[in-house]
């Protein structure tokens, strides 16, 4: 028997900011959509992804 949550906020949002979260820290703010990563995590992992780091 599976329990399905009910109420106004029980379904996933298919559009808008609530539908996209960072794959690293799961925040909804500052998302780079092609990477599905927030700007803070991007700065941390840019070198690992393959971007050149300039000082």
Curated annotation (Swiss-Prot):
Family indicated by similarity: Belongs to the universal ribosomal protein uS14 family.
Source organism per UniProt: Encephalitozoon cuniculi (strain GB-M1)
Cofactor field: Zn(2+)
The keyword Metal-binding belongs to this UniProt entry's keyword annotation: yes
Biological process according to GO: cytoplasmic translation
Name of this chain's protein: Small ribosomal subunit protein uS14
Region of interest (Disordered), ranges: 1-20
Keywords on record: Metal-binding, Ribonucleoprotein, Ribosomal protein, Zinc
Chain positions recorded as Zn(2+) binding sites: 22, 25, 38, 41
Molecular function per GO: structural constituent of ribosome; zinc ion binding
């Amino acid at each position: 028997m599976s329990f399905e949550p009910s109420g106004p906020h029980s379904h996933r949002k298919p559009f808008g900011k609530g539908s996209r979260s960072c794959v690293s820290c799961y925040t909804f703010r500052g998302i780079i959509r092609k990477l599905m990563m927030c700007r803070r995590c991007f700065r941390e992992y840019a070198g690992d992804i393959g971007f050149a780091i300039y000082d």
